[in-house]
């Protein structure tokens, strides 16, 4: 492994990803697939994180799981082998919150004196793992959390810290402006932090961080670039737009430039797009997708094996695996079609959440769950 010890994690460094919950906010997609395996920009959400960790030199990743672990193990093992990273599944018999999983994996996390990463599985950003190691080693304290700037801090808990990054206080959903920096769900800790946590349901944000901050053992590092918690459909689509914009800034060759494309678009090489289509801005089209002639798609994700019939118009939606959108259909308003959904010809769907294996034969003019 190359790189100076300040910028690349050491051989003994590992990461823990909080996979945990049921993914209820991203239903109906998570009724078919565990949330970490849902494709974001044509790649499972978790794979974005694993690749960034491996790129920073991490060779062992613990997945703290409590739900559908077998499916995740089976699918992720192939990807892990390709990346050359060891995946360890730490099974919770009861939900342990955001701190308990660290205690459950204590024997692995404390096997080396090196610091370890912890991250929430819903986060997508330009992962700053190398910079985080350097910042953490420079201040020499027990923990560092990554913070990011948001437009509406009153929806979140904000972080107050001094010019060196030493955290002074946390304020939950402030009514008056005190800061626009929030916890980005990415951390690095020394193993000594494990002495603060027991194997029981515990919130790291509410029960561990305040005590660390009081002892001046917790620092904040500013994230540059985009960030989004993509755990629900609206934010999933916003995160997709930010991610595609980031690819554009990096002049990524992954962006698609075929006929009828407007703005930032990803298209899997196995997808087919018909004549006279307008695709984009902000669209991802997955493997084996068929887009027929005269289709207009913007701000949307079309997952593997889906079919969009001719002259349909899709905006702000996610089309699930192997779903079929009929001819002359209009879909908008953060509609999510689950797996294997059929939308019949000439319908209007506005904000529908359609459960898997359903066939829709009537328009859905108002947001609702279709069961």
Curated annotation (Swiss-Prot):
Its EC number is 2.7.7.13. Its cofactor is Mg(2+). Keywords: GTP-binding, Magnesium, Metal-binding, Nucleotide-binding, Nucleotidyltransferase, Transferase. Transmembrane segments: none annotated. It comes from the Eukaryota. It holds the Pfam family NTP_transferase. This is Mannose-1-phosphate guanylyltransferase catalytic subunit beta. One of its GO terms (molecular function) is mannose-1-phosphate guanylyltransferase (GTP) activity. It is an enzyme of class 2 (transferase). The active site is at residue 173. Belongs to the transferase hexapeptide repeat family. It comes from Drosophila pseudoobscura pseudoobscura (Fruit fly). It catalyses: alpha-D-mannose 1-phosphate + GTP + H(+) = GDP-alpha-D-mannose + diphosphate. Enzyme activity is reduced by incorporation into the GMPPA-GMPPB mannose-1-phosphate guanylyltransferase complex. Allosterically inhibited, when part of the GMPPA-GMPPB complex, by GDP-alpha-D-mannose binding to Gmppa. Residues 14-233 are annotated as: Substrate-binding domain. The keyword Ribosomal protein does not apply. GO terms for biological process: GDP-mannose biosynthetic process. Residues 256-371 are annotated as: Hexapeptide repeat domain. Mg(2+) binds at residues 122, 229. PROSITE patterns: HEXAPEP_TRANSFERASES (PS00101). The N-terminal substrate-binding domain adopts a Rossman-like fold and has a binding pocket for GTP or GDP-alpha-D-mannose. Substrate binding is coordinated by an Mg(2+) ion. The C-terminal domain consists of a series of tandem hexapeptide repeats that adopt a beta-helix conformation. The beta-helix forms several protein interaction surfaces involved in assembly of the GMPPA-GMPPB mannose-1-phosphate guanylyltransferase complex. Catalytic subunit of the GMPPA-GMPPB mannose-1-phosphate guanylyltransferase complex. Catalyzes the formation of GDP-mannose, an essential precursor of glycan moieties of glycoproteins and glycolipids. Can catalyze the reverse reaction in vitro. Together with GMPPA regulates GDP-alpha-D-mannose levels. Coordinates binding with substrate and required for enzymatic activity. Component of the GMPPA-GMPPB mannose-1-phosphate guanylyltransferase complex composed of 4 Gmppa subunits and 8 Gmppb subunits; the complex is organized into three layers, a central layer made up of 2 Gmppa dimers sandwiched between two layers each made up of 2 Gmppb dimers. Gmppb catalytic activity is reduced when part of the complex and binding of GDP-alpha-D-Mannose by Gmppa induces allosteric feedback inhibition of Gmppb.
């Amino acid at each position: 492994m190359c790189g100076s010890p300040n910028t690349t994690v050491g051989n003994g460094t590992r990461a823990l990803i909080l996979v945990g919950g049921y993914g209820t906010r991203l239903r109906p997609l998570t009724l078919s697939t565990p949330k970490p395996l849902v494709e974001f920009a044509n790649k499972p959400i978790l794979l974005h994180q694993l690749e960034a960790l491996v790129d920073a030199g991490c060779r062992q990743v613990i997945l703290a799981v409590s739900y559908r672990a077998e499916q995740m193990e089976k699918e992720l093992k192939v990807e892990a082998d390709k990346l050359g990273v060891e995946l360890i599944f730490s099974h919770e018999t009861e939900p342990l919150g955001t701190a308990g999983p660290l205690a459950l994996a204590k024997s692995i996390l404390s096997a080396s004196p090196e610091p370890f990463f912890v991250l929430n599985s819903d986060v997508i950003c330009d992962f700053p793992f190398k910079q985080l190691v350097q910042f953490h080693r420079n201040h020499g304290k027990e923990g560092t959390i990554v913070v990011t700037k948001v437009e509406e801090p009153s929806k979140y808990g904000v972080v107050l810290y001094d010019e060196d990054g030493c955290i002074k206080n946390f304020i939950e959903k402030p009514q008056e402006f005190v800061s626009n920096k929030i916890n980005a769900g990415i951390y690095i800790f020394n193993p000594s932090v494990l002495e603060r946590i027991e194997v029981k349901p515990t919130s790291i944000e509410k029960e561990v961080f305040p005590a660390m901050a009081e002892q001046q053992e917790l620092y904040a590092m500013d994230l540059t670039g985009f960030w989004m918690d993509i755990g629900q459909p609206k934010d999933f689509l916003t995160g997709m737009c930010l991610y595609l914009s980031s690819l554009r800034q990096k002049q990524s060759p992954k962006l698609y430039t075929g006929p009828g494309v407007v703005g930032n678009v990803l298209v899997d090489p196995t997808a087919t797009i018909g004549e006279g289509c307008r695709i984009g801005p902000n669209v991802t089209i997955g493997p084996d997708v068929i887009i027929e002639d005269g289709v207009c798609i913007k701000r949307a994700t079309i997952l593997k094996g889906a079919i969009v019939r001719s002259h349909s118009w899709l905006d702000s939606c996610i089309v699930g695996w192997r779903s079929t959108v009929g001819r002359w259909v209009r879909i908008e308003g953060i509609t999510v079609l689950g797996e294997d959904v059929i939308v019949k010809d000439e319908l209007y769907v506005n904000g529908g959440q359609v459960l898997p294996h359903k066939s829709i034969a009537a328009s859905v003019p108002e947001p609702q769950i279709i069961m």
